[in-house]
Amino acid sequence: MTVSETESAVPVDASAYREAMSRLASAVHLITTDGPGGRAGFTASAVCSVSDAPPTLLVCINRAASAYAPLIRNGTLCVNTLGGGHETVAGLFGGRTPMDERFAAGTWRRLRSGAPALTDALVSFDCRIVERHAVGSHDVLYCAVEAVAAAGQADALLYSERRYRTLPRAPRGGSAPAEPARGARAIGARPPEGPVLALRSA
């Protein structure tokens, strides 16, 4: 066994892993659901695209989260990607605030699934959960996108180094800022209406 193999066999400390992950800048989303299991939602950064044929998103949720049981029972969700003015609602959905108070902080509409879609989100992806896998403390959800609603141009909300930050949008018809790191503005320390495009079900 080589030295490198020996070192790689040592488990990574969970706190060291969390510290390393805190250095990544991620988009911020509200994951919402409604249905037989009740209305619920939480703030998430563990969201990514899987495929565009068919359109599919991946969403991760801790099984200890208060939104977990309603989300799984409903089988549907809406991924609401937040803009720079949404740090307050992101903080509410990311803490221990009661569900009714979380939803009172925003204005909502319904798309295809019935899950609440934030009217001024940068974009909302209305989804149906098609696969679920348990990995460690979380469930990994594969979600078929059935409708998309975009609110237009706005700054993006990011989460990096345990702070919310804004990423200014690129000028219309132009390129992104030459130094996006300097353009990003820290706006908080807590872990934030347009046409609807219907997609065919997967």
From Swiss-Prot:
Annotated catalysed reactions: FMNH2 + NAD(+) = FMN + NADH + 2 H(+)
Membrane spanning stretches: none
GO BP, one annotated term: uracil catabolic process
Enzyme nomenclature, EC number: 1.5.1.42
Name this polypeptide is given: FMN reductase (NADH) RutF
Lineage, top ranks: Bacteria, Pseudomonadati, Pseudomonadota, Alphaproteobacteria, Hyphomicrobiales
Ranges of Low complexity composition bias in the record: 168-191
Gene this protein is translated from: rutF
Residue ranges of the region described as Disordered: 168-202
